[in-house]
Design a protein with these regions (language model features):
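Residue-level signal for inorganic ion chemistry
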Residues: 16, 32, 75, 189, ...
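Short beta-strand micro-motifs enriched in acidic
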Residues: 38-42, 131-135, 192-196, 437
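Extended interfacial segments that mediate partner engagement and assembly in macromolecular machines
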Residues: 52-64, 70-184, 196
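Rossmann-like S-adenosyl-L-methionine
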Residues: 4, 10, 211-438
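Short, solvent-exposed loop/turn elements at beta->coil junctions and helix N-caps
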Residues: 113-120, 187-192, 417-422
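Terminal RNA-binding accessory module
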Residues: 1-68, 98, 148, 345-346, ...
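Carbohydrate-binding surface patches
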Residues: 190-194, 198-210
Length: 438
């Protein structure tokens, strides 16, 4: 069937409509394309289709510098001009606020601010992950394809920090060589690199048990210039693997990055935004929204290793920082020591169970993709805080949660600023400023 792509979804697909008006999610097309597509599923309210050929290409199309972008799943929007990507991300936020958050067009027009971005649309990632596969009887490392069941062998990735582009090929080659003579049981391999500090860490994710530590360390050190090589040991069922421990095979045993005025050290399992320059925009927006005073008490929920905790502690009298992930809590404590900050209480545990008893003047929440639990919203709404900064990585759960805040009647969103941390993909962060209803 011939279809014209109307807009991009919050996902890799474009959205088109049949002559009868049925929505069709089309893989392989971008806004403005006219395509010949074949249906792969057809439900009562929407269908899915795959582009067979582009009949008339969109003026928004762009040439990708990546030779793998047509088959690799890492940059699904690489074929679209960057300005069009930014416009689509803004529109996805507006759409979610209207459809899910039930905000009016006038409210959205006032609330949503122009999207912010860092300088680089390529070469921005400080982290990349490689997955193992068996090809022609040999172990190969590569990236997940658009078909998630396939691993694409790559020699480089234009999304990764340019200075360290050759590291991918070196690591993949060294481990591929080793894995074909020793059973490394690799689950995945993470590479973190910082242009600012020069730190490069290779993290090997494997099950617990025997492991040729010395041999692996020597081969990787010979093949790459790294500051740290670690093994992250995991256990549990395949779909619910958890970290059992981390051991340093060579070097520092952690990765160091400079963000804003802070220096942070992170263990391999800990989360850190993959786009450091754009993460600094998040920090600026959070601090602008909260505008903390020296005598005030702040609360940082889902604080991770301290991305927002550290700048808050510089400006507030005291900060309670709550994080459920053990490795991140340990990293937070270490980062507080590095920063010589003693006005922060790191609290390990669930954000709801460990919600501080003392009311904070300002709060920042940076929950996972699932958003805030209803109980968390109720607790925040029950405080006497004057302002809340909500950092979200999913517009759908953000819109749902903002509606819940409005329904609670204590806080109302005054601004929502999208920030493009992930160029060439559909993902987008948003910082929302909520203030107490007068």
């Amino acid at each position: 069937m011939q279809l014209t792509i109307d807009t991009m979804t919050y996902g890799p697909d474009g959205l088109a409509h049949t002559p009868e008006g049925k929505a069709v999610f089309v893989a392989g097309g971008i806004t403005g394309d006219t395509v010949e597509a074949s249906f792969v599923s057809d439900g009562p309210s929407f269908a899915r289709a795959v582009t067979e050929r582009v009949i008339e290409p969109s003026p928004l199309r762009a040439d990708s510098p990546c030779p793998y972008s047509s088959i690799c799943g890492g940059c699904p929007w690489a074929g679209m001009a960057y300005g069009a990507q930014l416009a689509a991300k803004e529109e996805n936020l507006r759409s979610a606020l209207q459809r899910i958050g039930k905000f009016s067009g006038e409210q959205i027009e006032i609330m949503v601010k122009p999207i912010r971005r860092a300088k680089n649309e390529w070469g921005y990632r400080n982290k990349i992950e490689l997955a193992p596969s068996v090809q022609n009887g040999k172990i190969r490392l590569g990236m997940h394809g658009k078909d998630p069941s396939k691993i694409i062998k790559v020699d480089s990735c234009p999304l990764f920090e340019k200075k360290y582009g050759k590291t991918i090929k070196s690591v993949a080659g060294a481990l591929g060589f080793l894995a074909n003579s020793r059973d490394l049981e690799l689950e995945r391999v993470g590479i973190r690199a910082s242009r600012r500090t020069g730190a490069v860490e290779i993290a090997l994710w494997t099950p617990t048990g025997a492991f040729p530590r010395g041999q692996v360390a020597r081969v990787l050190q010979d093949a790459t210039k790294t500051s740290s090589i670690v093994r992250v040991m995991t256990k549990g069922e395949k779909k619910a693997r958890r970290v059992a421990g981390v051991e340093a095979l060579a070097g520092e045993g952690s990765w160091t990055e400079k963000i804003g005025t802070e220096t942070m050290r992170l263990s391999a399992p800990s989360f850190f935004q993959v786009n450091t320059a754009a993460a600094e925009i998040l920090i600026d927006l959070v601090m602008e929204a909260l505008d903390p005073e020296p005598e005030e008490f702040a609360c940082d929920l889902y604080c991770g290793a301290g991305t927002f905790t550290l700048p808050l502690a510089r400006r507030c009298d005291y900060v309670s920082a709550v994080e459920s992930y053990g490795p991140a809590v340990r990293d937070l404590r270490r980062n507080l020591d590095i920063a010589h900050l003693d006005n922060v209480e790191p609290i390990g545990g669930d954000a709801v169970r460990e919600f501080p008893e003392e009311d904070a003047d300002v709060l920042v929440v940076d929950p996972p993709r699932a958003g805030l639990a209803p109980e968390a919203i109720e607790l925040i709404a029950s405080t006497s805080a004057r302002d809340v900064a909500y950092v979200s990585c999913d517009p759908a759960t953000l819109a749902r949660d903002l509606r819940r805040f409005v329904d609670e009647g204590t806080f109302a969103p005054v601004s929502a600023t999208p920030v493009d941390l992930f160029p060439q993909t559909f993902h987008c962060e948003t910082v929302v400023h909520l203030t107490r209803v007068k």
